[in-house]
Amino acid sequence: MGNSPQKTTQVYELEEFFRFINYDFEKDLENIREICKLTKTRPKDSATKFFMDYGSEQPFLIKALANKINAKSFFEIGTGRGTGSYSVSLENNIKLVATLDRIPHFFKQDTAIEFKPIKISQRSLHKLITFKEKHKIKFFHNIQKPYLRTFYKNKFDIAFIDGNHTDENIIKNDIKLSLTLLNKDGIIIFDDYESKNSDRKFAVGAVVDEYLSKGLFYSYLIEFRGHLFNKEKKEKNAGVMVVSPYELI
């Protein structure tokens, strides 16, 4: 990932970061809201009407980063219900989204749509998404990693790692896979990074710190949960860590 001089991690609140990169989240609000309705809620007994909940800021941030670097390709580890991939696919310059998960595409899971419990597969969710841009997305299962290494080597502009958060070896292997698939100017985005100043719940922070100590990267911690929605719960010292071979701001 390049040979730029190592920098101290810069920390930004979400709205501050959006101002720096000239991104207006409201222009994407209607579309991403529709995606979040289907893919971002958990069962809530008290919820009678959909609203953008705490943490729904993430897809805006991922899409904004894709826009910032003029990305044409996006690789994701940890599909979940596809929130990130569907949102990034809406970016005009994006031509390819590849998303990898340990759960088969056809396997039904207990989840929620608009806070209401439902058992549904990723394949069935995909059919509910109305945006034509979803055709850009290719879904892969973990057993297809050798295929990805062979046919997608150095193909991606962004790797978004949002898979296992607790097993250090799995996270390290996710980094290795991402580096294989990224081109020389590609950036990595780590979800659920917690700074050393916080009470870390996940292994992500320690693994990323070790990775940063070995390389010559620019890094940015962007705090986002509760920064647009449910602002009374605004989170600090945690968010996504963006690692880049060049300066983003």
What are these regions (language model features)?
Residues 1-27:
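N-terminal auxiliary segments of SAM/dcSAM-dependent transferases
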Residues 23-69:
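Class I SAM-dependent methyltransferase Rossmann-like catalytic core
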Residues 48, 53, 59-249:
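S-adenosylmethionine/decaboxylated-SAM
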